[in-house]
């Protein structure tokens, strides 16, 4: 009788685990075309200029998990991630990369936009062999935060943006050494905001803000989980 009871208990446990695994899988969503939306309580954004790329959104690890794969040819660009809309200048973000394989040119960054002024910003924590932002950037010193040093850059751009097409400015903080994978990391965004402001680089009204994977002219993949530590 005891063995029969144990067998029933094990059987129920297996069925329960299968149910939760199935429910978790049912929350998965694959995106391969330009769009924004919500998934498991997080805002997401996916942009692809050319080439091939997809993002899979899941409910794993509190809902902030996503993975990407990309093959972008020589000039394709992909920006994909999960986060918040609107973002916040004081947000403290946690994240963990189960995988970040950027190929020849890819970044892992806290990424977003503001309007009035129209600004695209990056806090790059890891990147591939190519170090962003590349030519034409104005170097404006450094900021030390979250256990590392970041180089600050400002770039004037013109092209597609969240308001259409036209001029905008990029603000960059690029960490001098890549973050470790498979561990919990923190980005204290306000430390970058204050450092940028000291160089006259002010943000306006916050638009979306994501923990992003970007690939440019490369092949790669990522698996990222993000969460909010404080707003």
Could you describe each region identified by the protein language model?
Residues 78-145:
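Extracellular-facing segments of soluble proteins and assemblies that are Gly/Ser/Thr-biased and enriched
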Residues 116-181:
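An exposed acidic His-Trp-rich patch
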Residues 11-21:
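Bacterial N-terminal signal peptides
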Residues 182-231:
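Long, compositionally biased interface segments
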Residues 29-81:
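N-terminal segment immediately downstream of the Sec signal-peptide cleavage site
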Residues 97-104, 113-116, 177, 210-221:
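Short, flexible beta-strand-to-coil junctions
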